[in-house]
Amino acid sequence: MKAAPFETRTQVHSLSAELAQRQEADRRCLRAELRLYCFVTCISQGLSSLLAETGAAAIWLGPLCLLPGLLLLGLGALCKRLTAAPTLTEAFRAGLHPALARVWQGYGFLLLCWQGESLLTDMVCLFTEGVVTNVEPFWMALVTLLAALCCCQEKGLPRCVWLLRFPLLVLALLLLADLLTKAQLDFLHPISGAGDAVNQRLFLSQNALGWPLLLFAELPPGTGRRETGPLPPLVLFLLMLSAAVLALPTELAMTAKNLADAMLLPLVFLTPTNRLLALVGWMVGLLLALAISLRRGTSLLRALGKPHPSWPFYAGLAVLLLAPQTAGTQTLRHMLKLLQPWLLAPGAALLLALVPGAVLCQRRRSA
């Protein structure tokens, strides 16, 4: 009797299907990386600037400061759709000129440098002013940069963030629930916070709060129908900021003497265990966000030129971020605040210039 041939029920994928699955997995990792970056940068500015300087008014100033970034993201999505480009950089190439695509990449690099310097300053202040370690700020900045460079793997960092997304989310929800148990509606008064003049000044200085949203325009389109994009980190940021406002009276929120006090003051009302977890999570989040700035900045530098080995770019970018730390944290914070109101102006000009080119590109394709 002839034996039946061996049969397998394992599904055999083609090479193209396997490649598509890998690309989708890499895209999900990059999306998780951007979501963490967006949340950490927004909550850092929200606590250290909005809540510390205007108190209860931060509950409505936060969404207002996100609007310019959201508008530019919508404009970028429109240009991508008109040019049928997978990323905004490709939309610049198709709608205008490859040279302007390089200008857009250079603009993104400068934004990442500014944010990286801001995150590095936050980390240094957190250790030297908050935890009170007997280390000079410059050496603390050097140690922080070395730790961030150890995390800067081209594909390893996004995958690490993807693996940590649920533990970090659980931690954030735990802290949010703890803050909400201390919430009091009376702390919403006065809703104008420190006054209209302070609120107007804060809006003008924090109008670039949502600039990391522009990075989502560089994500290639996914296969899923329901793409939430930056919505989850923005919702979580607004919930955390609202919970901090409801847990702190305006008079107490505005007593922060330095950056570390402003970042750590909302943790005072947490339980001791949650306070420790919040401090650890805060440091991990800032370190990962700094590493993301370094990794993405290096990727843009390599994209502007020939694909040389990445380590010289990492070293050069680290030196670029470390050099301003010699000026002192207070002077550096003042310089960063002077630049912040103008961060979105070049991006808005470039996107407005792209719109007519994108419309012409669509007409050429439909003709």
Task: Show where each model-derived region lies.
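Membrane-interface loop-to-helix entry segments
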Residues: 123, 137-140, 149-180, 340-352
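Hydrophobic alpha-helical segments and their helix-loop junctions in multi-pass secondary transporters
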Residues: 30, 116-120, 167-193, 351-366
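Membrane-interface interhelical connector segments
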Residues: 247-275
